[in-house]
């Protein structure tokens, strides 16, 4: 039996690669001569680039850039020939910022623009960027600063490059801006369709989880809108521009980037269609499968790309009651790995073992003679 194992990461627990390896161990315990092909995936959220780099065997490199509080910090990126990938969360992710320092209006993203300039200087032509899981809400002003834009208040004083400065922004200088060469293509791997502004935008949708006081939502949202009406009105209409606290919008406006489906691009990059052309079973999974998963998340994206006639089974941390009845979206069956009632902390810690057990049990079911 040949099985493709293509899970997303389990948030705050296991990377997609670790999930795939645990499931493989489970099948090896219960199915003789099973062939497991690991294809960790991501939909544009945090962990997507890490999943892709395992599948493509990319080389890890590092560059010193401006960190979230203005200090110098080393940032990773992954490269193969003229292709490079990196994840914004590697510099300004929620996990990188101590709780006591979490203020999305003070987090700086200038380093992202600096890294883009470096990659272009190294003859990179294809750049893929994951923008999920950020701690910032700067509307993309940091990206612009990293690409040479400068910002001033009413008195002509240079402003710090963070979201807070949008509230005092009076003018923008493009004198030293960096032009992206025409032969360089920058693509944003997105898993959300939030616009920059409005009640479905970056601030209202993600501000609270990043530590922004709700009393600030209206002022910050308006400041981002005012900023883009000055520099790039068209970006205000882009679906997905609100991803990463507006970093996606900044990349589109100042680096001529385009927003693409995170999961479909991931599957294209790892040549998923070829890998799944002659398999007996496909396994998908993520930490929590719910109705939101139906809107472009990894498990559904993988299932839709799986050929008709190849069964798809989901192995997830938890299954939420709002899911439609199975089968749905080409997924034939879904299993939660939770074995007992226990604190969330323990479930996260034991996830690898529970994945093994669940996969092993599914393997035993597959071994049963047809009834």
Swiss-Prot record:
Catalysed reaction equations from the record: (R)-glycerate + ATP = (2R)-3-phosphoglycerate + ADP + H(+)
GO molecular function: ATP binding; glycerate 2-kinase activity; glycerate kinase activity
Top enzyme category: transferase
EC number(s) on file: 2.7.1.31
Annotated Gene3D superfamilies: Glycerate kinase, domain 1, Glycerate kinase, domain 2
Keywords, comma-separated and alphabetical: ATP-binding, Kinase, Nucleotide-binding, Transferase
Family: Belongs to the glycerate kinase type-1 family.
PANTHER family assigned: GLYCERATE KINASE
Family matches, as NCBIfam families: glycerate kinase (TIGR00045)
Protein name: Glycerate kinase
Native source species: Neisseria meningitidis serogroup B (strain ATCC BAA-335 / MC58)
């Amino acid at each position: 039996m040949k099985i493709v194992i293509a899970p997303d990461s389990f948030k705050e627990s296991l990377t997609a690669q670790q999930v795939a390896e645990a499931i493989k161990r489970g099948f090896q315990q219960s199915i003789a001569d099973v062939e497991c092909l690991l294809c960790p995936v991501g939909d544009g959220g945090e962990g997507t680039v890490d999943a892709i780099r395992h599948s493509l065997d990319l080389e890890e490199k590092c560059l010193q850039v401006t960190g979230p509080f203005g200090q110098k910090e080393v940032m990773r990126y992954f490269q193969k020939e003229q292709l490079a990938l990196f994840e914004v969360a590697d510099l300004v992710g929620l996990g990188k910022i101590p709780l006591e320092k979490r203020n999305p209006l003070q987090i700086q993203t200038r380093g992202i623009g600096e890294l883009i300039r470096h990659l272009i200087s190294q003859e990179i032509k294809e750049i893929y960027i994951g923008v999920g899981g950020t701690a910032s809400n700067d509307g993309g002003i940091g990206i612009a600063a990293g690409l040479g834009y400068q910002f001033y208040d009413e008195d002509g004083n240079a402003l710090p490059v963070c979201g807070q400065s949008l509230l005092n922004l009076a003018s923008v200088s493009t004198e030293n801006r960096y032009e992206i060469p025409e032969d360089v293509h920058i693509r944003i791997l997105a898993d959300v369709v939030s616009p920059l502004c409005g009640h479905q935008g970056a601030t209202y949708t993600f501000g609270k989880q990043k530590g922004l006081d709700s009393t600030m939502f209206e002022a910050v949202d308006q400041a981002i809108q005012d900023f883009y009406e000055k520099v790039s009105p068209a970006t205000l209409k882009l679906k997905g521009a609100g991803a990463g606290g507006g970093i996606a919008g900044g990349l589109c406006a100042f680096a001529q980037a385009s927003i693409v489906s995170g999961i479909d691009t991931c599957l294209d990059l790892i040549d998923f269609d070829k890998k799944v052309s002659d398999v007996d079973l496909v396994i998908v999974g993520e930490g929590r499968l719910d109705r939101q998963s139906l809107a472009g998340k990894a498990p559904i994206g993988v299932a839709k790309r799986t050929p008709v006639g190849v069964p798809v089974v989901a192995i997830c941390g938890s299954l939420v009651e709002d899911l439609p009845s199975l089968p749905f979206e080409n997924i034939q069956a879904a299993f939660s790995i939770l074995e007992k009632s226990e604190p969330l902390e323990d479930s996260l810690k034991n996830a690898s073992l529970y994945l093994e057990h669940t996969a092993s049990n599914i393997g035993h079911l597959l071994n049963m003679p047809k009834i």
